[in-house]
Amino acid sequence: ARAMEELDQRGEAYNREIPVGIMIETPAAVMLSDILACHVDFFSIGSNDLIQYTTASDRMNERVQYLYDSCNLSVLRSIKLVCDNARARKVDVGICGETASEPRLIPLWCAMGINELSVAPALAGRTKYIINQTSKADLEPVMDAILAQGSVPAARERLDQILRELGL
């Protein structure tokens, strides 16, 4: 939005219909996502940073690396909150980072209503295949059960069970 204001001030022509979005990479952005959704067309969830900041971990530091877990319930619930707030304002949600192409999480992303997964080209075929095997309507009730799990291992096992049930 600020860039558009600057272009307007300089009298430069540009596409006024270009979608404006923001990255959701911190717990603070998650908590404000209901307010932020009023000002944008889309969210892009930066999963690598969100996991790191939510779990107080560092993927590159071997002393705390073990805390970095894509199936951490705080992370999954945070992403669900962002999706719910976005849906309430008709804001699209994408996710980037390693979790976007993590097989056990792809059905969960579909159930949450994530519109776009940003994945490495080498993983696009597998990711598309998993998406095509996934039914959002069938997985929405399962998603709530996963997010209500009492432990990360239990959530991970349920996610893996979904993949097995899908024949993946």
Residues covered by each model-derived region:
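Conserved alpha/beta-domain cores
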Residues: 1-168
